[in-house]
Design a protein with these regions (language model features):
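Conserved helicase motor core of SF1/SF2 NTP-dependent helicases
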Residues: 96, 103-191
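Accessory N-terminal region flanking or inserted into the helicase ATPase core
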Residues: 12-98, 107-112, 135
């Protein structure tokens, strides 16, 4: 049995306010817990996959228990809001849904999207699997590249940079595994 008064320091900030979403990412265990929830996975499994462990499994589980105990007093975090949307929100029918930066959606966020698209006539999904930056929170570009059937359009010219940056980016890109093959051109300038 946890002594919640003693464990409270785990989820309170230095000025004694209840932790907010930003705080969960400052605490290693709560960040891993949030990643597990975003991946729709067992937190212990995600903990075991982590190569660097700042807390023991016992401390990890205690922090989760304490965090959830304090949230019972009508506190929710961002991940809770997404989970509630899946179960509690009836999304209205839409003519068009446009989703951008889709490479950074987590499995939990995709669950909401799957529910929304049931009532959508046309979906536009935009993103670049080479630009995924939220893997730390459970995002995986493979969901973006494989979920929606239909026509896929790859833009063949970037307007962001010229030849030198294009060449350098292609060297880096070759090191990205499971990336959709793209051949694109660049602006007529050096930078």
């Amino acid at each position: 049995m946890l002594d919640y008064a003693m464990e409270a320091k785990i989820i309170k900030t230095s000025d004694n306010r209840l932790a907010d979403d930003n705080f969960t990412y400052k605490d290693w265990s709560l960040g891993v817990y949030d990643k597990a929830r975003n991946m729709l996975e067992d937190p212990k499994l995600i903990y075991k996959r982590e190569t660097y462990k700042k807390d023991s499994l016992d401390v990890f589980l205690r922090k989760i228990s304490t965090y959830e105990h304090y949230k019972k007093d009508s506190f929710i975090d961002f991940t809770d809001m997404i989970m509630r949307a899946i179960d509690e929100v009836n999304f209205p029918p839409l003519e068009v849904l446009i989703l951008d930066e889709a490479q950074d959606f987590t499995p939990l966020q995709w669950s909401v999207i799957y529910k929304i698209v049931d009532n959508v006539k046309r979906v536009y999904l935009a993103g670049d699997d080479d630009q995924g930056i939220y893997k730390w929170n459970g995002a995986d570009p493979k969901y973006f590249t494989t979920y929606f059937p239909g026509r896929h359009v790859i833009l063949r010219k970037t307007r962001r940079f010229g030849e030198a940056i294009h060449h350098f980016s292609q060297i880096i890109r070759r090191g990205i595994f499971d990336s959709v093959e793209k051949d694109y051109d660049y602006q007529d300038k050096q930078g």
